[in-house]
A protein has these predicted regions:
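N-terminal export leaders
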Residues: 1-4
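Serine-esterase "nucleophile elbow" of acetyl-processing enzymes
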Residues: 19-69, 79-87
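Alpha-helical cap/lid subdomain in secreted, periplasmic
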Residues: 22, 49, 56-59, 75-215
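Cleavable N-terminal signal peptides
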Residues: 7-8, 18
Length: 215
């Protein structure tokens, strides 16, 4: 009986034995129109482009698009439970741009984002926080209070932070639509190029490593 068990175990360890593939890491991109892909086909939206970029580097991931155009941080909080289903293993949180455009009190935005973070932590779902910067025309006081939200929350909750989601896109006509706000398909590619190293750091925290070619 022992010989049979040993032979069976040895057979299972032979080179070339087919092993079941691990399922992909399930992420959710929770955000507004910048995540949803305003006026873009689904395959050109941020989550889809990021997923392809990560897969090209050997990561096994699936990124659900939970972006809603026009959403605020409070709106994201209201829909958190159904936008981030059970089984989610990480969240890329991108909210606050519409709060800023509406001149919402930064204290309101901060509270909503922090509540989202805390509730996800309670569910043991790690968060990558994608930051936003206030427009210059909102004044120095508002900008100071708003811009501090993201680094403050990242420090307080030990989050991976990408300081400015639209870095390389905001103010660049070649990368924005005619409204001057939303990224074009080219702009989304620029966003992904910028955030990719930060996402890889986040995946490292989750124990996710890229597969080596040939595996």
């Amino acid at each position: 009986m022992l010989l049979f068990a040993a032979a069976t175990l040895a057979a299972g360890l032979r080179p070339g034995t087919v092993q079941a593939e691990e399922p992909p890491l399930k992420l959710v991109a929770l955000g507004d129109s910048l995540t949803a892909g305003y006026r873009l086909p689904a395959e050109a939206a941020f989550p889809a482009v990021l997923e392809r970029a990560l897969k090209a580097k050997g990561y096994r991931v699936e990124i659900a698009n939970a972006g809603v155009s026009g959403d605020t941080s409070t709106g994201g909080l209201d829909r958190l439970d159904w936008s981030v289903p059970d089984g989610t293993q990480g969240v890329i949180l991108e909210l606050g741009a519409n709060d800023m455009l509406r001149g919402t009190d930064p204290a309101v935005t901060r509270k909503a984002l922090e509540t989202i973070i805390v509730r996800l932590k309670e569910r043991r779902i790690p968060v990558l926080l994608a930051g936003m910067l206030a427009a210059p025309n909102l004044g120095t006081e508002y900008r100071t209070r708003f811009d501090a939200i993201y680094p403050d929350l990242a420090r307080a909750h030990d989050l991976v932070l990408y300081p400015f989601f639209l870095d390389g896109v905001a103010g660049q006509r070649a990368n924005t639509m005619d409204d001057g706000l939303h990224p074009t398909a080219k702009g989304v590619e620029r966003v992904v190029e910028g955030i990719l190293p930060t996402v890889e750091t986040f995946l490292g925290r989750l124990g996710q490593k890229p597969e080596q070619k040939g595996q």
